[in-house]
Amino acid sequence: MHITKLNLVNYRNFKNVKLHFHKGINTVIGENASGKTNLFRAMRLLLDNSMPRSSTKLSEDDFCRSLGPWKGHWIIISCEFSDISSDEASQSLFLHGNGNIDGESEVVTKATYNLIFRPKAHIRQALSILPPGDATALEECLSDVSIEDYETVLTGKSTANFADPEEYKSIVGDFDAIVFPSELNNPAVGVRLPYILNMPNEVSFTFIKALRDVVSDFHNNRTNPLLTLLKNKSGEISPEDFQPIAELIGTLNENIEGLPDVCDIRDDITSTVGDTVGDTYSPNSISIRSSLTDDSDQLFQSLKLFVAESNDVHEGAIHEMSLGGANLLYLTLKLLEFKYQKANQSIANFLLIEEPEAHIHTHIQKSLFDNINYDNTQIIYSTHSSHISEVSNIKNMNIIGVVEGNCEVFQPATGLSDPQCGFVQRYLDAIRSNLLFARSVILVEGDAEEILIPVLFKKVTGLSLDEMGISLVNIRSTGFENIAMLFSDERIKKRCSIITDLDDTFFDTTIRNTDSVPLKKKKKKAQGSKESGQSRKTALDTFCTGNQWLKPFYADHTFEVDFIKSSNSSYLKKIVNDVYVDPATRVTAKGELSNADIAISGVRALTMANHQGKGWFAITLGNAINFKVVIPKYIFEAIKFAHGEFKPELVLKVLSHRYQRIVEHVAEGTMNMRAAEAAGNLVLKTKWETYLAPYETGIEIFSPKWEAFDLLIDDIDDIKAEFIADFPTENNHFLERI
């Protein structure tokens, strides 16, 4: 038996989500504070018998905050099971409580188990007789409701689809239209289960939290996994096999008791008592006995585990192990415990592991979760480790994300064929699997974009893509569709920008008879690239049409050419000496880069990139740029789409960054101007004065406005407009688009 679905309605940060699970290993992925711990707690409320009974009595803090006023609403935690065993114990449990009979066979194959936290009957009755649409009556009815007016019920055999908001309204009520059902106990909610049918007592359920103190667990007889294993094995030892051990223990006890020193102490105690209280009040007899047990269960409890870690030969006790080693050992013992489960000892085994990466090395993470597989145990683990997600089966994956302020759960394999899933599975290595954790994604085709886009954005805005929650992924080809298909309404609801080149020509490609053979080949290749770019655009536009989560953005030519077209030639001229060694080539390159004709400067930019290698060229260029660089429009628009609206707080950070860089730039320029003056170079001094004058004027005008600005009171758009106006020589056009 295994869990197939889990539905959470109005529970903590989940307003209404459905998770899908499969046999074997399942992964729950989500960033910090996404709700992974809340999800596991919900499952524990249903199935973990180590949770106190009182924990099912929820509080107002357990209601989803995005719900608004909680009074009158229900919290629903609903679980569906499949592949229920045909053995008598399983069938009897579910037939009378939770199960749904499969056709004419009268065998239970599926079952539901629900925890419902709802208003008591008198509150539901009062709501049912409210006049439709009467908001005042609803407010009055709920005004005195407290958490004490709520009850927890456990039900089975439910038919309701709790994930459907309309079905929720039909069962609970429509709080907007103020219409509530007259039926107080809708049969779709299921049959209320008697306390004798206690699911947590029928399943084996273990929860391993992220920062678990496993050393304490090993010292506690109730939670020691080694002791559980030994108990299972001790029951298999026949009395005949154990008899020689019992006899040895009996002999050992007799030998200890018969030691001369022990006998002397016994005799001294007897005589001292007699001397003290006299013969009348002295004990009849006194013995000192060895209490080594010959009971097999108690003997096994005395056994302790000693381990030599992989880099050590000394076998030490558990408390001597590293934290990671102890956690790994605890985890493997729990898995072995499930493997040893006796027939019909429990109807199912569940193991929940919270963020195993907390104590386990990355290589062990990958190895453990790549190889772990026990048929009789369903394992569900949460993670924000890209190393674990790399080896996770995408078909068995749930991703928790935030869409418009609400937590939602995505299944990335929904609707994908086996070959498509296989491709995605192979592609998502430890680096690329970051796209599963990010709030939004940008896909690029090459090294230049992967290296330079984060640098450009950081230099210009002072913000990192990581800070924006954007994961930039290098596809290393133009085959974006194979990964972009993950982002859709039915799979992952996250924004994904695609950046690629149109490879349009930027020089005359007319082939003439007078052209040399190499020139003809160059022109023909450029024409072919243009045609391929247009075909790629048509296909990509068609692929993204109608998908609100996907949008392509195109460089007219290539990254290098579009970069220089965006008024960035000065940065390319800075690195000419790093790219070329030959003095003549350096002079020629600088001259061509200064040419306003893109057919000349663009060719040189591309030649430099190809000469050094696009990846190394991007690194060299990244070291040369500063805050004055211009981000090509298509790149900025791709970032803007991926991130969404720039909130005032972010815009303020950008303005602060640019203002500080301008102040530093002027200070540095002033030093250069004074150095030129000291050297007697009046021409250079004058150039610096002319260059710095508009900046100094801008600082003088803008500084009082900046110091007086208060985000809580003033409009961010106003101070942004002032900044643009006061620094007219800056490339601040991007500010108008945020």
Spans of model-derived segments:
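Extended helical coiled-coil dimerization/tether regions that scaffold
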Residues: A210-L329, L333-N349, F507-D508
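Conserved P-loop NTP-binding catalytic core
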Residues: F40-T109
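Charged C-terminal transducer/switch regions of large nucleotide-driven machines
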Residues: W74-I76, E80-D83, F117, L138, ...
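Switch/communication elements of ASCE P-loop NTPase nucleotide-binding domains
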Residues: M1-D48, L305-S433, E450-I451, K458, ...
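Conserved catalytic network of the ASCE P-loop NTPase/AAA+ motor domain
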Residues: E31, G68-H73, S85, S105-V108, ...
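Acidic, divalent-metal-binding catalytic cores of TOPRIM
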Residues: N398-I738
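Switch/connector loops and helix/strand junctions flanking conserved nucleotide-binding motifs
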Residues: S85-Q91, I123-L127, V215-H219, S389-V391, ...
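Electropositive, glycine-dotted interaction segments
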Residues: L93-K233
